[in-house]
């Protein structure tokens, strides 16, 4: 059954436009509260709510609190806290569910609602459908004796900081390192610099002055130029960039070289292999560069691909019992450290890996160079049989690139576009293959 309101990462959109309106979010909180009450019959459920620094967070938090308490659910509020911090505290405090108010790397004019189940894991499709079924029902507030309470929780930041630090090797520290930390004027501004400082690093903080409107604005993991300049200006060893809700990571070295999620995953996996730790393998996505796959296999590390999205990477990790996964966008999962993507913890794992390998980022990542990619968006008509039109040329290109490149065709879920991606050992092979396939699709 198709979902009506939930996307791949909760409910998200432009503030003031459906579904990110106070009245809908009130109903969403009430519907989720009803489902919790039905599932937790022994005692009154308690939900933890965190948020990033968007101005709309105040409005949406109030609406959620009203909905949950009307359904008979207690609420604890953390204030600004990274998404993985909400997941951790939901598990650590043994709460019924967690909710994060954020639109991740989007601009301040967007926002969203993301749910975590008991244990800090993402909601199943079945539970999301249960919630959706109740959203359109009439709200019937619980009798006064059964209404929920709401309160602010103290020490949430400190609990999460200590958890992050606990994932770094206990026999080591970060003394001698100078780091620039860019928190994207987002949810990590109050916690990320403290984590690295308390582990001994000299920390320079940027993107740490949120005003409600500047989240992700020319800063953070989606805009690394600011970090590159700051690393150079401060003569730092590395720069660490998070996104608005703190679950993505990009890094920069002293030469201003940017390292994406693929490169950082490789560093972590290589160090684990060097230590003899059995990680099972690495899960990437259909967009992960083929050169990384080959480099991992040369280290004796298995590799598989999931659909694009950290949700699908997580599914594959759980199914296979593997420990490391992620995507180039900076979502990195280290399942032996946390059960969700965490930018701070991922950065700590990279820094620990560099100590284990006794090399810098540039040296480790010199093991492989990304294959050149050509991407072409082909606009099509509704109902156009593009698969049939392109199958012969697709087969030809795939045969030519066997063992030295690959092809990915993806139909957009939001617009009438087919995305053609070809990567190959040589740039002209990739360009030629992509152009031939795009021409065969036809387009308009």
Swiss-Prot record:
User: According to its UniProt record, which reaction does this protein catalyse?
Assistant: alpha-D-glucosamine 1-phosphate = D-glucosamine 6-phosphate
The UniProt entry, under Gene3D superfamilies, shows:
Alpha-D-Glucose-1,6-Bisphosphate, subunit A, domain 3 (3.40.120.10), Alpha-D-phosphohexomutase, C-terminal domain (3.30.310.50)
**What SUPFAM superfamilies does its record include?**
Phosphoglucomutase, C-terminal domain, Phosphoglucomutase, first 3 domains
Which InterPro entries does its entry note?
A-D-PHexomutase_a/b/a-I (IPR005844), A-D-PHexomutase_a/b/a-I/II/III (IPR016055), A-D-PHexomutase_a/b/a-II (IPR005845), A-D-PHexomutase_a/b/a-III (IPR005846), A-D-PHexomutase_C (IPR005843), A-D-PHexomutase_C_sf (IPR036900), Alpha-D-phosphohexomutase_SF (IPR005841), GlmM_bact (IPR006352)
List residues modified as Phosphoserine.
104
Q: Which residues form the active site?
A: 104
Please indicate if the UniProt record lists Iron as a keyword: no
Residue positions annotated to bind Mg(2+) are 104, 243, 245, 247
Q: What is its EC number?
A: 5.4.2.10
Q: Its GO biological process terms? A: carbohydrate metabolic process; peptidoglycan biosynthetic process; UDP-N-acetylglucosamine biosynthetic process
Query: Sorted alphabetically, which keywords does the UniProt record give?
Result: Isomerase, Magnesium, Metal-binding, Phosphoprotein
Q: Give the free-text PTM comment from the record.
A: Activated by phosphorylation.
State any single GO MF term.
phosphoglucosamine mutase activity
Family, as annotated: Belongs to the phosphohexose mutase family.
Q: What does this protein do?
A: Catalyzes the conversion of glucosamine-6-phosphate to glucosamine-1-phosphate.
Instruction: Spell out the protein name for this chain.
Output: Phosphoglucosamine mutase
Per the UniProt entry, what species is this protein from, by scientific name?
A: Neisseria gonorrhoeae (strain ATCC 700825 / FA 1090)
């Amino acid at each position: 059954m198709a979902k009506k309101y939930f996307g791949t990462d909760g409910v998200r959109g432009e503030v003031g436009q459906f579904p990110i309106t106070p009245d809908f979010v009130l109903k969403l909180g009430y519907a989720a509260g009803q489902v919790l009450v039905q599932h937790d019959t022994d005692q009154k459920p308690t939900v933890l709510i965190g948020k990033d620094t968007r101005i709309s967070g105040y409005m949406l938090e109030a609406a959620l609190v009203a909905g949950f308490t009307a359904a008979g659910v207690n609420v604890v509020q953390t204030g600004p806290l990274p998404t993985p911090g909400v997941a951790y505290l939901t598990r650590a405090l043994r709460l019924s569910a967690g909710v994060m108010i954020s639109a991740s790397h989007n601009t301040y004019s967007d926002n969203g609602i993301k749910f975590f189940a008991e244990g800090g894991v993402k909601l199943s499709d079945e539970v999301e459908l249960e919630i959706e079924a109740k959203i359109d029902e009439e709200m019937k507030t619980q009798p006064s004796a059964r209404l929920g309470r709401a309160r602010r929780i103290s020490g949430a930041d400190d609990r999460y900081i200590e958890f992050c630090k606990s994932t770094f090797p206990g026999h080591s520290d970060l003394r001698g390192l100078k780091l620039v930390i860019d928190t994207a004027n987002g949810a990590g501004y109050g916690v990320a610099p403290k984590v690295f400082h308390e582990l001994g690093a000299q920390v320079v903080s940027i993107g740490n002055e949120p005003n409600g409107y500047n989240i992700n604005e020319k800063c953070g993991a989606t805009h690394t130029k600011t970090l590159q300049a700051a690393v150079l200006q401060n003569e730092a060893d590395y720069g660490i960039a998070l996104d608005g809700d703190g679950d993505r990571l990009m890094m920069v070295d002293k030469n201003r070289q940017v390292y994406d999620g693929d490169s950082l995953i490789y560093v972590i996996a290589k160090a684990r292999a060097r230590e003899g730790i059995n990680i099972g393998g690495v899960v990437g996505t259909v967009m992960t560069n083929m050169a990384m796959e080959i480099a991992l296999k040369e280290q004796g590390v298995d590799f598989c691909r999931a659909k694009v999205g950290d949700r699908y990477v997580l599914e594959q990790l759980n199914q296979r019992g593997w420990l490391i996964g992620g995507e180039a966008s900076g979502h990195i999962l280290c399942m032996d450290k946390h059960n969700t993507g965490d930018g701070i913890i991922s950065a700590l794992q990279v820094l620990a890996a560099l100590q284990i390998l006794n090399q810098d980022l540039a040296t480790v990542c010199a093991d492989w160079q990304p294959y050149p990619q050509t991407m072409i968006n082909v606009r099509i008509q509704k109902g156009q049989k593009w698969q049939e039109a392109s199958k012969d040329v697709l087969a030809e290109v795939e045969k030519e690139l066997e063992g030295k490149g690959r092809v990915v065709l993806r139909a957009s879920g939001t617009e009438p576009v087919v995305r053609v991606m070809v990567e190959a050992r040589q740039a002209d092979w990739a360009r030629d293959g992509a152009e031939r396939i795009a021409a065969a699709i036809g387009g308009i």
